[in-house]
Amino acid sequence: MKIVGDSEHFKQPYDSNDEYVSKTEDKRDCEAAQKVGMELVSLSKTQLDKIELDEHLYDSIQQAHKIKPKTEAYRRHMQYIGKLMRNVDIEPIKASLAVVLNKNSNETAKLQMFEKMRERLLTQGDGEIQTVVEHYPQLDRQKLRTLVRQATKELAKGPESKSSKELFKYLRSEIQD
């Protein structure tokens, strides 16, 4: 009886020195590509224009904006976008996406900072005006004091006031951090 050892006949595809990718790994990669596609669909047109995409992929994302979410057609279209994403190098898209999303979070943080500053100005009065003017010397103290006074008077009458909005706009336009 002849014992057959490591013959070519018994070798499996994963026995070679090539890197073997399991089905599970392949599925994970496909799902990751589809998630990136979903993030791209959630962006606005101006944000999407900042990311360099394949023309066919860009058109598909634009079509996804026209389909109602939570429908079967939307789900199928998202799978199609995932399929297109598998044929494209995802890393540069992820990097561009991170830049676009980070810029948005920075903008939101700035607006929240102005909102908090306005609230402090309205609640603490002249002491806070002095602190803000010392920190941001480009602000006109007299105009700031006038806006705070008007907004405080209007807030006593009702919740949102025109002067309060003007104060916010003034802070946002004058402070460039």
Curated annotation (Swiss-Prot):
Compartmental location: Cytoplasm
GO cellular component, one term: cytosol
Region annotation Disordered: where it falls in the sequence: 1-26
Residue pairs linked by disulfide bridges in the UniProt entry: none
rRNA-binding recorded as keyword: yes
Keywords: Cytoplasm, Ribosome biogenesis, RNA-binding, rRNA-binding
One record GO biological process: assembly of large subunit precursor of preribosome
Biased composition regions of type Basic and acidic residues, renumbered to the chain: 1-12
Molecular function as annotated in GO: ribosome binding; rRNA binding
InterPro entries: DarP, DarP_sf
Gene3D superfamilies assigned: PSPTO4464-like domains
SUPFAM superfamilies: PSPTO4464-like
Function, as annotated: Member of a network of 50S ribosomal subunit biogenesis factors which assembles along the 30S-50S interface, preventing incorrect 23S rRNA structures from forming. Promotes peptidyl transferase center (PTC) maturation.
Family of the protein in this entry: Belongs to the DarP family.
Protein name: Dual-action ribosomal maturation protein DarP
Natural source organism: Shewanella oneidensis (strain ATCC 700550 / JCM 31522 / CIP 106686 / LMG 19005 / NCIMB 14063 / MR-1)
Gene: darP
